[in-house]
A protein has these predicted regions:
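Short, flexible active-site-adjacent loop segments at beta-strand->alpha-helix junctions, enriched
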Residues: 16-18, 94-95, 170
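Substrate-recognition element of Asp-dependent hydrolases with the DxDx(T/V) motif
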Residues: 66, 75-111, 131
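Active-site neighborhood of HAD-like aspartate-dependent phosphohydrolases
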Residues: 1-53
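Flexible, glycine-rich phosphate/dinucleotide-binding loops
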Residues: 21, 97, 173
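Short, Lys/Arg-enriched, disordered terminal segments
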Residues: 1-3, 84, 191-196
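C-terminal cap/substrate-recognition subdomain and adjoining C-terminal extension
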Residues: 103-146, 151-196
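Short hydrophobic segments within beta-strands
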Residues: 7, 91-93, 148, 167
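Short, basic/glycine-rich phosphate-binding loops at helix/coil junctions
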Residues: 46-62, 95
Length: 196
């Protein structure tokens, strides 16, 4: 039995495509701007905007994203299969002061929306950790054996200690090395975990 940590944005959701879709609409309609760096991790990098314009975008769309973003195909199905033999930990910065939500909703409302979204999308788990802390510390404290992550900084840091499944995105293409296993779909993740 393993303890498997799973991130939300970029792993359970396709935040990369969502930011490209909604960001290009918002910045084009409002400012006539276009995508500057499709490999950016944050919307601010994708559209090369300052914090003020980035906050403006998220203030407009964060609630919509949080409540209605779709899960990646087969995420709930594969997580249920993994849960049969493992403990599932959802580990997210959402519901913390690091989240884009700070100008839109309270931390507690954000946590409630996350919990409702997980339930609505039938994502079953054993524990959820809302934390702005370094995810490596969270993994160590909770004895996580494997992390499924998309953020380059987290992938590179966590993989120094435990295996990380890198959910492929344009912004994390440069992540590779010992303990990093690139996957492209939830059933690809399932296959990789079964082989470990």
């Amino acid at each position: 039995m393993m303890k498997i940590g799973i991130d939300i944005d970029g792993v359970l959701t396709d935040v990369e495509q969502w930011q490209l879709d909604y960001g290009s609409k918002y910045y084009y309609e409002k400012y006539g701007m276009k995508i500057k760096n499709y490999k950016g991790y944050e919307a601010s990098e994708i559209f090369d905007v300052d914090k003020k314009l980035d906050d403006e975008f998220w203030n407009e769309y964060f609630r919509e994203y949080s409540i209605n973003v779709e899960t990646r195909k087969f995420a709930n199905e594969v997580i249920d299969k993994l849960k049969e033999e493992n403990e599932i930990y959802i580990i997210t910065a959402r519901g913390s002061f690091l989240s884009h939500s700070t100008g839109v909703m309270s931390i507690e409302e954000n946590k409630t929306i996350v919990l409702n979204w997980l339930e609505k999308n039938q994502i079953h788990y054993d524990n959820i950790i809302f934390s702005p802390e370094d995810k490596l510390d969270i993994c160590k404290q909770n004895k996580i054996n494997l992390m499924i992550e998309d953020k380059p900084e987290n992938i590179n840091t966590i993989s120094k200690e435990i295996p990380v499944i890198c959910y492929h995105a344009n912004y994390n293409e440069q992540c590779n090395g010992k303990n990093i296993y690139r996957c492209y779909s939830w059933y690809d993740i399932y296959r990789k975990i079964k082989e470990m």
